[in-house]
């Protein structure tokens, strides 16, 4: 895993989002419209986070998933920044800010799923081979 100084120098946008809890512009991230099968990993530490099997089109402007690949891969934190009350999602392994989770995902088996709204820059897709 790269140090914060290395991260800041090599990828300032990733540093801003992952370490300063920033948000990338909507509809600009490289994975918003991605359809490839694979596993999305943390761009900071390479931990497995989200499977493409749970990715869906939310029209929010960010990649959205119904569940992490493993609930133990992420941690959830109260976020009241910007005058809003939200639930922040972080990588459990390195603490990188990934995005937020909302309770307005698609319906499955008569229940509304969560919508993990994740910044593309915080992810690295490793396609299935």
Task: Give each language-model segment a name.
Residues 1-129:
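A short Gly-Trp-Pro
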């Amino acid at each position: 895993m790269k140090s914060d100084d290395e991260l800041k120098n090599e990828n300032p946008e990733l540093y801003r989002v992952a370490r300063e809890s920033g948000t990338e512009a909507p509809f600009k991230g490289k994975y918003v419209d991605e359809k490839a099968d694979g596993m999305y990993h943390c761009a900071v530490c390479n931990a497995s986070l989200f499977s493409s099997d749970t990715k869906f089109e939310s029209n929010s402007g960010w990649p959205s998933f119904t569940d992490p690949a493993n609930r133990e891969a992420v941690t959830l934190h109260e976020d009241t920044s910007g005058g809003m009350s939200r639930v922040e999602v972080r990588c459990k392994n390195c603490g990188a800010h990934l995005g937020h989770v909302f309770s307005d995902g698609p319906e499955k088996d008569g229940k509304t799923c969560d919508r993990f709204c994740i910044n593309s820059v915080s992810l690295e897709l490793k396609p299935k081979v």
